[in-house]
Protein backbone atom coordinates (compact mmCIF):
# COMPACT_ATOMS: atom_id res chain seq x y z
CA UNK A 1 0.00 0.00 0.00
CA UNK A 2 1.27 3.47 -0.84
CA UNK A 3 2.09 5.89 1.96
CA UNK A 4 0.87 9.44 2.43
CA UNK A 5 3.41 11.90 3.78
CA UNK A 6 2.26 14.74 5.94
CA UNK A 7 3.28 18.32 6.34
CA UNK A 8 4.51 19.43 9.76
CA UNK A 9 6.49 17.50 12.36
CA UNK A 10 7.53 18.63 15.82
CA UNK A 11 11.14 19.25 16.83
CA UNK A 12 13.27 16.93 18.95
CA UNK A 13 11.56 15.90 22.16
CA UNK A 14 12.78 13.44 24.76
CA UNK A 15 10.17 11.82 26.96
CA UNK A 16 10.72 9.83 30.12
CA UNK A 17 7.66 8.14 31.60
CA UNK A 18 8.39 5.53 34.27
CA UNK A 19 10.57 3.04 32.41
CA UNK A 20 9.54 4.44 29.03
CA UNK A 21 12.07 6.37 26.95
CA UNK A 22 11.30 7.64 23.47
CA UNK A 23 13.09 9.95 21.04
CA UNK A 24 11.42 11.61 18.08
CA UNK A 25 12.79 14.00 15.48
CA UNK A 26 11.62 16.38 12.79
CA UNK A 27 13.16 14.55 9.84
CA UNK A 28 10.97 13.35 7.00
CA UNK A 29 11.69 9.75 7.99
CA UNK A 30 10.64 8.93 11.53
CA UNK A 31 13.59 7.58 13.57
CA UNK A 32 13.55 4.19 15.20
CA UNK A 33 12.56 4.49 18.84
CA UNK A 34 13.94 2.53 21.73
CA UNK A 35 12.15 -0.77 22.36
CA UNK A 36 10.23 -0.30 25.56
CA UNK A 37 7.51 -2.85 26.02
CA UNK A 38 7.92 -6.24 24.36
CA UNK A 39 10.90 -8.06 22.95
CA UNK A 40 11.74 -7.67 19.28
CA UNK A 41 12.21 -11.42 18.95
CA UNK A 42 8.99 -13.30 18.14
CA UNK A 43 8.04 -15.73 20.89
CA UNK A 44 10.74 -14.38 23.18
CA UNK A 45 10.62 -15.52 26.77
CA UNK A 46 8.09 -13.45 28.72
CA UNK A 47 9.14 -11.14 31.48
CA UNK A 48 9.16 -12.63 34.94
CA UNK A 49 5.66 -12.36 36.42
CA UNK A 50 5.43 -9.42 38.74
CA UNK A 51 1.71 -8.76 39.07
CA UNK A 52 0.31 -12.28 39.36
CA UNK A 53 -2.54 -11.57 36.96
CA UNK A 54 -4.95 -14.46 36.38
CA UNK A 55 -5.85 -14.14 32.67
CA UNK A 56 -9.19 -15.83 33.16
CA UNK A 57 -10.10 -14.26 36.48
CA UNK A 58 -13.50 -15.45 37.67
CA UNK A 59 -15.16 -15.14 34.27
CA UNK A 60 -17.91 -17.71 33.85
CA UNK A 61 -18.08 -17.31 30.08
CA UNK A 62 -16.12 -19.72 27.88
CA UNK A 63 -14.45 -19.16 24.52
CA UNK A 64 -15.87 -21.76 22.13
CA UNK A 65 -12.63 -23.13 20.73
CA UNK A 66 -14.56 -25.29 18.26
CA UNK A 67 -15.17 -22.04 16.35
CA UNK A 68 -11.42 -21.28 16.22
CA UNK A 69 -10.32 -23.01 13.02
CA UNK A 70 -6.95 -21.33 12.55
CA UNK A 71 -4.41 -22.83 15.01
CA UNK A 72 -2.46 -19.57 14.87
CA UNK A 73 -5.27 -17.86 16.79
CA UNK A 74 -4.95 -20.39 19.61
CA UNK A 75 -1.22 -19.64 19.71
CA UNK A 76 -2.01 -15.95 20.01
CA UNK A 77 -4.35 -16.74 22.92
CA UNK A 78 -1.56 -18.65 24.68
CA UNK A 79 0.87 -15.81 24.07
CA UNK A 80 -1.55 -13.30 25.58
CA UNK A 81 -2.08 -15.47 28.67
CA UNK A 82 1.67 -15.99 29.13
CA UNK A 83 2.45 -12.28 28.78
CA UNK A 84 -0.58 -10.78 30.53
CA UNK A 85 1.51 -9.31 33.37
CA UNK A 86 3.62 -7.26 30.96
CA UNK A 87 0.49 -6.29 29.01
CA UNK A 88 -1.07 -4.87 32.17
CA UNK A 89 2.17 -3.06 32.95
CA UNK A 90 2.01 -1.50 29.48
CA UNK A 91 -1.40 -0.09 30.36
CA UNK A 92 -0.14 1.18 33.71
CA UNK A 93 2.67 3.11 32.02
CA UNK A 94 0.19 4.57 29.51
CA UNK A 95 -2.15 5.77 32.26
CA UNK A 96 0.78 7.14 34.28
CA UNK A 97 1.47 9.58 31.42
CA UNK A 98 -1.05 12.44 31.83
CA UNK A 99 -2.71 13.56 28.58
CA UNK A 100 -5.25 16.22 29.52
CA UNK A 101 -6.33 18.09 26.40
CA UNK A 102 -8.28 20.85 28.13
CA UNK A 103 -5.26 21.93 30.19
CA UNK A 104 -2.47 20.74 27.90
CA UNK A 105 -0.88 18.65 30.65
CA UNK A 106 1.28 15.96 29.07
CA UNK A 107 -0.18 16.34 25.58
CA UNK A 108 3.10 16.76 23.70
CA UNK A 109 4.74 13.91 25.61
CA UNK A 110 1.74 11.67 25.01
CA UNK A 111 1.77 12.28 21.27
CA UNK A 112 5.33 11.02 21.07
CA UNK A 113 4.49 8.11 23.35
CA UNK A 114 1.77 7.09 20.89
CA UNK A 115 4.23 7.43 18.02
CA UNK A 116 6.47 5.08 19.99
CA UNK A 117 3.67 2.51 20.15
CA UNK A 118 3.32 2.62 16.37
CA UNK A 119 7.08 2.41 15.83
CA UNK A 120 7.17 -0.56 18.19
CA UNK A 121 4.47 -2.28 16.16
CA UNK A 122 6.70 -2.01 13.11
CA UNK A 123 4.78 0.66 11.22
CA UNK A 124 6.96 1.86 8.34
CA UNK A 125 5.77 5.46 8.54
CA UNK A 126 4.99 7.30 11.76
CA UNK A 127 4.65 11.02 12.29
CA UNK A 128 3.53 13.52 14.91
CA UNK A 129 1.81 16.40 13.12
CA UNK A 130 0.68 19.87 14.16
CA UNK A 131 -2.70 20.68 12.53
CA UNK A 132 -2.33 24.39 13.35
CA UNK A 133 -5.04 26.85 14.40
CA UNK A 134 -8.60 25.50 14.24
CA UNK A 135 -11.69 27.22 12.88
CA UNK A 136 -12.63 28.02 16.48
CA UNK A 137 -9.41 30.00 17.00
CA UNK A 138 -7.72 27.45 19.28
CA UNK A 139 -4.37 25.76 18.69
CA UNK A 140 -4.94 22.11 17.79
CA UNK A 141 -3.23 19.35 19.72
CA UNK A 142 -0.96 17.01 17.74
CA UNK A 143 -2.30 14.12 15.73
CA UNK A 144 -0.23 10.97 15.29
CA UNK A 145 -0.30 9.21 11.93
CA UNK A 146 1.11 5.78 11.09
CA UNK A 147 1.06 3.27 8.24
CA UNK A 148 1.67 -0.42 8.94
CA UNK A 149 2.00 -2.14 5.56
CA UNK A 150 1.78 -5.88 6.23
CA UNK A 151 1.40 -6.90 2.61
CA UNK A 152 -2.15 -8.00 3.40
CA UNK A 153 -5.16 -7.96 1.09
CA UNK A 154 -7.29 -5.74 3.33
CA UNK A 155 -6.51 -2.40 4.94
CA UNK A 156 -8.09 -1.18 8.18
CA UNK A 157 -8.04 2.40 9.41
CA UNK A 158 -7.88 2.65 13.21
CA UNK A 159 -9.24 5.56 15.26
CA UNK A 160 -7.49 6.42 18.53
CA UNK A 161 -7.81 9.25 21.01
CA UNK A 162 -4.94 9.78 23.42
CA UNK A 163 -6.39 12.66 25.46
CA UNK A 164 -8.42 12.45 28.65
CA UNK A 165 -10.56 14.64 30.86
CA UNK A 166 -9.00 16.71 33.66
CA UNK A 167 -9.13 15.65 37.31
CA UNK A 168 -12.00 17.73 38.70
CA UNK A 169 -12.48 16.09 42.13
CA UNK A 170 -9.08 14.83 43.32
CA UNK A 171 -10.24 14.24 46.89
CA UNK A 172 -12.73 11.59 45.75
CA UNK A 173 -10.15 9.29 44.16
CA UNK A 174 -9.28 6.12 46.08
CA UNK A 175 -5.76 6.28 44.64
CA UNK A 176 -3.88 8.98 42.72
CA UNK A 177 -5.45 9.26 39.25
CA UNK A 178 -2.12 8.96 37.40
CA UNK A 179 -0.70 6.15 39.53
CA UNK A 180 -2.63 3.36 37.75
CA UNK A 181 -2.96 1.31 40.92
CA UNK A 182 -4.40 -2.21 40.75
CA UNK A 183 -7.14 -2.66 43.35
CA UNK A 184 -9.99 -5.00 44.17
CA UNK A 185 -13.43 -3.77 43.16
CA UNK A 186 -16.11 -6.43 43.72
CA UNK A 187 -17.04 -8.50 41.86
CA UNK A 188 -13.65 -8.03 40.19
CA UNK A 189 -10.48 -9.10 42.00
CA UNK A 190 -8.33 -6.74 39.97
CA UNK A 191 -9.10 -3.47 38.20
CA UNK A 192 -6.84 -0.52 37.36
CA UNK A 193 -7.97 2.84 38.68
CA UNK A 194 -6.75 5.87 36.77
CA UNK A 195 -7.74 8.77 34.54
CA UNK A 196 -8.26 7.42 31.04
CA UNK A 197 -8.35 3.78 32.19
CA UNK A 198 -11.76 3.23 30.61
CA UNK A 199 -11.92 6.23 28.27
CA UNK A 200 -10.00 5.10 26.34
CA UNK A 201 -6.51 3.86 27.24
CA UNK A 202 -7.61 0.40 28.40
CA UNK A 203 -9.19 -0.45 25.06
CA UNK A 204 -6.35 1.13 23.09
CA UNK A 205 -3.66 -0.77 24.97
CA UNK A 206 -5.67 -3.98 24.61
CA UNK A 207 -5.75 -3.39 20.84
CA UNK A 208 -2.02 -2.65 20.79
CA UNK A 209 -1.19 -5.67 22.97
CA UNK A 210 -3.31 -7.87 20.69
CA UNK A 211 -1.50 -6.63 17.57
CA UNK A 212 1.90 -7.09 19.23
CA UNK A 213 0.90 -10.63 20.23
CA UNK A 214 -0.13 -11.50 16.68
CA UNK A 215 3.18 -10.16 15.39
CA UNK A 216 5.11 -12.18 17.97
CA UNK A 217 3.32 -15.38 16.92
CA UNK A 218 2.84 -14.89 13.18
CA UNK A 219 5.49 -12.36 12.22
CA UNK A 220 2.95 -10.10 10.49
CA UNK A 221 -0.60 -8.84 10.94
CA UNK A 222 -3.62 -10.22 9.03
CA UNK A 223 -4.46 -6.72 7.76
CA UNK A 224 -2.65 -3.50 6.91
CA UNK A 225 -3.28 -0.72 9.43
CA UNK A 226 -3.55 3.05 9.09
CA UNK A 227 -3.59 4.75 12.50
CA UNK A 228 -4.66 8.31 13.19
CA UNK A 229 -4.68 9.26 16.87
CA UNK A 230 -6.06 12.57 18.09
CA UNK A 231 -5.38 14.62 21.19
CA UNK A 232 -8.53 16.74 20.99
CA UNK A 233 -11.44 14.33 21.50
CA UNK A 234 -12.33 15.94 24.82
CA UNK A 235 -12.21 19.31 23.02
CA UNK A 236 -14.79 18.29 20.41
CA UNK A 237 -12.08 16.90 18.08
CA UNK A 238 -11.40 20.42 16.82
CA UNK A 239 -7.85 19.65 15.69
CA UNK A 240 -8.72 16.23 14.28
CA UNK A 241 -11.52 17.79 12.24
CA UNK A 242 -9.12 20.32 10.73
CA UNK A 243 -6.45 17.73 10.04
CA UNK A 244 -8.80 15.26 8.33
CA UNK A 245 -10.33 17.98 6.16
CA UNK A 246 -6.88 19.35 5.28
CA UNK A 247 -5.63 15.87 4.31
CA UNK A 248 -8.48 14.17 2.42
CA UNK A 249 -6.23 11.45 0.94
CA UNK A 250 -5.17 9.83 4.21
CA UNK A 251 -7.62 6.93 4.21
CA UNK A 252 -8.33 6.43 0.52
CA UNK A 253 -6.89 2.91 0.70
CA UNK A 254 -8.83 1.90 3.82
CA UNK A 255 -11.52 -0.73 3.32
CA UNK A 256 -13.01 -0.32 6.82
CA UNK A 257 -12.39 1.60 10.03
CA UNK A 258 -11.99 0.19 13.54
CA UNK A 259 -13.93 2.83 15.46
CA UNK A 260 -16.94 3.43 17.65
CA UNK A 261 -19.77 3.04 15.15
CA UNK A 262 -22.60 5.53 14.83
CA UNK A 263 -22.64 8.74 16.86
CA UNK A 264 -25.01 11.24 18.41
CA UNK A 265 -24.45 14.94 17.78
CA UNK A 266 -22.96 17.27 20.38
CA UNK A 267 -22.30 21.00 20.35
CA UNK A 268 -20.50 22.75 23.23
CA UNK A 269 -20.99 26.41 24.05
CA UNK A 270 -20.04 28.86 26.75
CA UNK A 271 -22.51 31.54 27.85
CA UNK A 272 -20.79 34.68 29.13
CA UNK A 273 -22.40 37.51 31.11
CA UNK A 274 -20.55 40.63 32.21
CA UNK A 275 -21.30 43.97 33.77
CA UNK A 276 -19.45 45.64 30.92
CA UNK A 277 -21.71 44.17 28.22
CA UNK A 278 -24.88 44.48 30.32
CA UNK A 279 -24.19 48.09 31.28
CA UNK A 280 -24.96 47.41 34.94
CA UNK A 281 -22.96 45.98 37.85
CA UNK A 282 -19.15 45.80 38.06
CA UNK A 283 -17.53 46.48 34.70
CA UNK A 284 -13.75 46.16 35.00
CA UNK A 285 -13.20 43.59 37.75
CA UNK A 286 -14.82 41.92 40.74
CA UNK A 287 -15.68 44.30 43.57
CA UNK A 288 -16.40 43.92 47.29
CA UNK A 289 -19.48 41.76 47.90
CA UNK A 290 -20.84 44.26 50.39
CA UNK A 291 -21.54 46.53 47.44
CA UNK A 292 -24.42 44.25 46.40
CA UNK A 293 -26.62 46.47 48.58
CA UNK A 294 -26.33 49.17 45.95
CA UNK A 295 -25.00 47.48 42.77
CA UNK A 296 -26.65 45.03 40.35
CA UNK A 297 -25.18 41.51 40.08
CA UNK A 298 -24.39 40.04 36.63
CA UNK A 299 -24.11 36.60 38.29
CA UNK A 300 -27.71 36.64 39.59
CA UNK A 301 -28.91 37.77 36.18
CA UNK A 302 -26.98 34.92 34.55
CA UNK A 303 -28.69 32.41 36.86
CA UNK A 304 -32.09 33.88 35.94
CA UNK A 305 -31.15 33.60 32.27
CA UNK A 306 -30.21 29.92 32.63
CA UNK A 307 -33.58 29.21 34.24
CA UNK A 308 -35.35 30.25 31.02
CA UNK A 309 -33.51 27.61 28.97
CA UNK A 310 -34.98 24.50 30.64
CA UNK A 311 -38.18 23.57 32.44
CA UNK A 312 -38.49 23.22 36.21
CA UNK A 313 -37.08 19.67 36.13
CA UNK A 314 -34.06 20.73 34.11
CA UNK A 315 -34.79 17.86 31.72
CA UNK A 316 -36.66 19.55 28.87
CA UNK A 317 -35.09 22.27 26.73
CA UNK A 318 -37.36 25.33 26.45
CA UNK A 319 -35.69 26.93 23.43
CA UNK A 320 -38.28 27.60 20.72
CA UNK A 321 -38.05 25.04 17.91
CA UNK A 322 -35.43 22.89 19.62
CA UNK A 323 -37.34 19.65 19.02
CA UNK A 324 -38.84 20.56 15.63
CA UNK A 325 -36.48 18.65 13.33
CA UNK A 326 -36.16 15.37 15.24
CA UNK A 327 -36.76 12.24 13.16
CA UNK A 328 -38.75 9.56 15.05
CA UNK A 329 -37.13 6.22 15.79
CA UNK A 330 -37.62 3.54 13.16
CA UNK A 331 -39.22 0.19 13.95
CA UNK A 332 -35.78 -1.44 13.80
CA UNK A 333 -34.37 1.05 16.30
CA UNK A 334 -37.37 0.59 18.59
CA UNK A 335 -36.79 -3.17 18.49
CA UNK A 336 -33.12 -2.73 19.42
CA UNK A 337 -34.03 -0.59 22.41
CA UNK A 338 -36.76 -3.00 23.51
CA UNK A 339 -34.31 -5.91 23.37
CA UNK A 340 -31.71 -3.95 25.32
CA UNK A 341 -34.32 -3.09 27.96
CA UNK A 342 -35.30 -6.72 28.56
CA UNK A 343 -32.22 -7.53 30.64
CA UNK A 344 -31.58 -4.01 31.90
CA UNK A 345 -31.74 -3.61 35.69
CA UNK A 346 -32.41 0.08 36.29
CA UNK A 347 -31.38 0.07 39.96
CA UNK A 348 -28.12 -1.80 39.39
CA UNK A 349 -27.25 0.42 36.42
CA UNK A 350 -27.87 3.56 38.47
CA UNK A 351 -25.70 2.27 41.31
CA UNK A 352 -22.84 1.41 38.95
CA UNK A 353 -23.09 4.84 37.33
CA UNK A 354 -23.01 6.50 40.74
CA UNK A 355 -26.42 8.22 40.55
CA UNK A 356 -29.34 8.00 42.97
CA UNK A 357 -31.75 7.12 40.17
CA UNK A 358 -32.45 7.81 36.50
CA UNK A 359 -34.98 10.34 35.24
CA UNK A 360 -37.29 7.41 34.48
CA UNK A 361 -37.65 4.05 36.23
CA UNK A 362 -38.74 2.34 33.00
CA UNK A 363 -35.90 0.29 31.41
CA UNK A 364 -37.04 1.08 27.87
CA UNK A 365 -37.24 4.83 28.54
CA UNK A 366 -33.78 4.82 30.12
CA UNK A 367 -32.37 3.00 27.08
CA UNK A 368 -34.10 5.45 24.75
CA UNK A 369 -32.84 8.47 26.68
CA UNK A 370 -29.32 7.05 26.74
CA UNK A 371 -29.12 6.31 23.03
CA UNK A 372 -31.54 8.71 21.32
CA UNK A 373 -32.16 11.43 23.88
CA UNK A 374 -31.68 15.19 23.54
CA UNK A 375 -30.47 17.44 26.32
CA UNK A 376 -28.89 20.69 27.41
CA UNK A 377 -26.44 20.13 30.25
CA UNK A 378 -24.83 22.58 32.65
CA UNK A 379 -21.25 21.25 32.60
CA UNK A 380 -19.74 23.94 34.76
CA UNK A 381 -20.13 27.51 35.98
CA UNK A 382 -17.58 29.90 37.44
CA UNK A 383 -17.25 33.44 38.76
CA UNK A 384 -16.03 35.30 41.81
CA UNK A 385 -15.11 33.44 45.01
CA UNK A 386 -14.72 29.78 44.04
CA UNK A 387 -12.96 28.57 47.19
CA UNK A 388 -14.96 26.03 49.18
CA UNK A 389 -15.42 26.98 52.82
CA UNK A 390 -14.32 30.20 54.48
CA UNK A 391 -15.58 33.59 53.40
CA UNK A 392 -14.57 36.50 51.22
CA UNK A 393 -17.17 38.92 49.91
CA UNK A 394 -17.06 39.18 46.12
CA UNK A 395 -19.48 40.69 43.61
CA UNK A 396 -18.29 39.20 40.28
CA UNK A 397 -18.13 41.32 37.17
CA UNK A 398 -18.17 38.29 34.86
CA UNK A 399 -19.73 34.82 34.93
CA UNK A 400 -19.29 31.93 32.50
CA UNK A 401 -21.29 28.73 32.20
CA UNK A 402 -20.42 25.79 29.94
CA UNK A 403 -23.08 23.66 28.24
CA UNK A 404 -23.30 20.72 25.89
CA UNK A 405 -26.32 20.01 23.75
CA UNK A 406 -26.81 16.37 22.70
CA UNK A 407 -28.79 16.14 19.49
CA UNK A 408 -30.06 13.63 16.93
CA UNK A 409 -31.24 13.60 13.28
CA UNK A 410 -32.19 16.01 11.79
CA UNK A 411 -31.05 18.59 14.31
CA UNK A 412 -27.78 20.42 13.62
CA UNK A 413 -25.32 22.19 15.87
CA UNK A 414 -25.37 25.53 14.01
CA UNK A 415 -29.18 25.57 14.03
CA UNK A 416 -29.25 24.90 17.77
CA UNK A 417 -26.82 27.76 18.36
CA UNK A 418 -28.95 30.09 16.20
CA UNK A 419 -32.09 29.12 18.14
CA UNK A 420 -30.23 29.67 21.40
CA UNK A 421 -29.26 33.17 20.24
CA UNK A 422 -32.87 33.92 19.29
CA UNK A 423 -34.08 32.67 22.69
CA UNK A 424 -31.66 34.87 24.60
CA UNK A 425 -32.58 37.92 22.53
CA UNK A 426 -36.30 37.23 22.95
CA UNK A 427 -35.93 37.13 26.74
CA UNK A 428 -33.90 40.33 26.97
CA UNK A 429 -30.41 38.84 27.14
CA UNK A 430 -28.99 40.35 23.96
CA UNK A 431 -25.75 41.14 25.79
CA UNK A 432 -25.02 37.52 26.77
CA UNK A 433 -22.19 36.21 24.60
CA UNK A 434 -22.24 32.73 23.04
CA UNK A 435 -18.81 31.18 22.51
CA UNK A 436 -19.00 28.01 20.39
CA UNK A 437 -16.31 25.63 21.67
CA UNK A 438 -16.91 22.93 19.07
CA UNK A 439 -19.51 20.87 17.25
CA UNK A 440 -19.55 17.17 16.38
CA UNK A 441 -22.50 16.31 14.09
CA UNK A 442 -24.34 13.00 14.38
CA UNK A 443 -23.44 10.15 12.05
CA UNK A 444 -25.62 7.29 10.84
CA UNK A 445 -24.36 3.86 9.85
CA UNK A 446 -25.45 0.24 9.63
CA UNK A 447 -24.09 -3.27 10.26
CA UNK A 448 -24.06 -4.29 6.61
CA UNK A 449 -20.28 -4.62 6.22
CA UNK A 450 -17.60 -7.28 6.54
CA UNK A 451 -16.09 -5.91 9.76
CA UNK A 452 -19.45 -5.88 11.56
CA UNK A 453 -20.06 -9.47 10.47
CA UNK A 454 -16.61 -10.48 11.71
CA UNK A 455 -17.33 -8.89 15.09
CA UNK A 456 -20.62 -10.78 15.29
CA UNK A 457 -18.75 -14.02 14.67
CA UNK A 458 -16.28 -13.12 17.41
CA UNK A 459 -19.03 -12.36 19.92
CA UNK A 460 -20.65 -15.74 19.24
CA UNK A 461 -17.30 -17.42 19.81
CA UNK A 462 -16.86 -15.62 23.13
CA UNK A 463 -20.42 -16.33 24.31
CA UNK A 464 -21.12 -12.62 24.53
CA UNK A 465 -24.43 -12.71 22.66
CA UNK A 466 -25.51 -10.63 19.72
CA UNK A 467 -28.41 -8.30 18.98
CA UNK A 468 -29.99 -8.69 15.58
CA UNK A 469 -27.92 -6.95 12.87
CA UNK A 470 -29.11 -3.54 11.68
CA UNK A 471 -29.34 -3.20 7.91
CA UNK A 472 -30.64 0.37 7.95
CA UNK A 473 -28.67 3.37 9.13
CA UNK A 474 -29.10 4.43 12.77
CA UNK A 475 -27.32 6.70 15.26
CA UNK A 476 -27.66 4.46 18.32
CA UNK A 477 -24.16 5.25 19.57
CA UNK A 478 -22.25 7.65 21.77
CA UNK A 479 -20.45 10.79 20.64
CA UNK A 480 -17.17 10.57 18.71
CA UNK A 481 -16.08 12.21 15.40
CA UNK A 482 -17.65 9.45 13.28
CA UNK A 483 -19.15 12.00 10.89
CA UNK A 484 -15.72 12.63 9.37
CA UNK A 485 -15.69 9.03 8.12
CA UNK A 486 -19.41 8.64 7.42
CA UNK A 487 -19.88 11.12 4.58
CA UNK A 488 -18.19 14.38 5.61
CA UNK A 489 -14.74 13.55 4.18
CA UNK A 490 -14.80 9.77 3.79
CA UNK A 491 -17.51 7.16 3.57
CA UNK A 492 -15.99 4.06 5.17
CA UNK A 493 -17.78 1.16 6.91
CA UNK A 494 -17.10 1.58 10.64
CA UNK A 495 -17.33 -0.88 13.52
CA UNK A 496 -15.40 -2.18 16.48
CA UNK A 497 -16.04 -4.95 18.94
CA UNK A 498 -14.53 -6.61 21.99
CA UNK A 499 -15.49 -8.17 25.29
CA UNK A 500 -14.61 -6.74 28.71
CA UNK A 501 -14.30 -3.07 29.58
CA UNK A 502 -14.53 -0.74 32.53
CA UNK A 503 -16.50 2.19 33.90
CA UNK A 504 -16.46 5.64 35.45
CA UNK A 505 -15.54 7.60 32.32
CA UNK A 506 -15.04 11.32 33.21
CA UNK A 507 -15.66 10.46 36.89
CA UNK A 508 -13.55 9.89 39.97
CA UNK A 509 -12.14 6.36 40.25
CA UNK A 510 -12.42 5.60 36.55
CA UNK A 511 -11.44 1.95 36.13
CA UNK A 512 -10.58 -0.80 33.66
CA UNK A 513 -11.23 -4.47 34.41
CA UNK A 514 -8.06 -6.58 34.55
CA UNK A 515 -9.47 -9.85 35.91
CA UNK A 516 -13.03 -10.53 34.81
CA UNK A 517 -15.89 -12.06 36.79
CA UNK A 518 -19.31 -13.50 36.03
CA UNK A 519 -20.37 -12.55 32.51
CA UNK A 520 -17.53 -10.06 32.07
CA UNK A 521 -14.12 -10.80 30.59
CA UNK A 522 -10.92 -9.15 31.78
CA UNK A 523 -8.06 -7.62 29.82
CA UNK A 524 -6.79 -10.93 28.42
CA UNK A 525 -10.28 -11.69 27.14
CA UNK A 526 -10.51 -8.28 25.49
CA UNK A 527 -7.18 -8.76 23.74
CA UNK A 528 -8.21 -12.22 22.51
CA UNK A 529 -11.55 -10.91 21.25
CA UNK A 530 -9.86 -8.12 19.28
CA UNK A 531 -7.37 -10.56 17.75
CA UNK A 532 -10.20 -12.93 16.83
CA UNK A 533 -12.23 -10.17 15.18
CA UNK A 534 -9.20 -9.11 13.10
CA UNK A 535 -8.56 -12.68 11.94
CA UNK A 536 -12.26 -13.12 11.13
CA UNK A 537 -12.32 -9.91 9.10
CA UNK A 538 -9.19 -10.96 7.21
CA UNK A 539 -10.88 -14.25 6.28
CA UNK A 540 -8.25 -16.25 8.14
CA UNK A 541 -10.53 -18.28 10.40
CA UNK A 542 -12.43 -20.18 7.75
CA UNK A 543 -13.50 -23.74 8.48
CA UNK A 544 -11.65 -26.11 6.15
Regions found by a protein language model. Give the residues of each.
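C-terminal motif of bacterial Sec signal peptides marking the signal peptidase cleavage site
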Residues: 23-25
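Fold-level recognition of mixed alpha/beta catalytic cores in primary-metabolism enzymes, strongest
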Residues: 196-361, 367-374, 506, 511-523
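Bacterial N-terminal signal peptides that target proteins for export
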Residues: 1-14
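Bacterial signal peptide processing site
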Residues: 27-29
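A non-catalytic alpha/beta surface segment that caps or lines the substrate-entry region
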Residues: 90, 100-154, 179
Amino acid sequence: MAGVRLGVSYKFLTVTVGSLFLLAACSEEAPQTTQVMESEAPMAAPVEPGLGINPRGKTELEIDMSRIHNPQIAEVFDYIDTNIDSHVENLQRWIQQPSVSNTGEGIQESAYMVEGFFDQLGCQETEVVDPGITEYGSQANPVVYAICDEGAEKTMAVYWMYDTMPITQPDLWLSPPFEARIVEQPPFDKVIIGRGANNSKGRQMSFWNAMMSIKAVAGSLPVNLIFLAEGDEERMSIGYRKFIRDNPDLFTEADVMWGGGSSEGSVFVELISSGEQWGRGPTYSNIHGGRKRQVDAPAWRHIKMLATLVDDTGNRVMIDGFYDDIVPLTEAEEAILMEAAEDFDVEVAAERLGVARFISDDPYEVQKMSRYGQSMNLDGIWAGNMFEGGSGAILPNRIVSKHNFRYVPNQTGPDIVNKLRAHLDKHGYEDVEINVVGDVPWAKMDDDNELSMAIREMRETFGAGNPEPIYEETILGGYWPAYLFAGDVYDIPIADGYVGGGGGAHAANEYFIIEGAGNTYGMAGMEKSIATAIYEYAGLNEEE
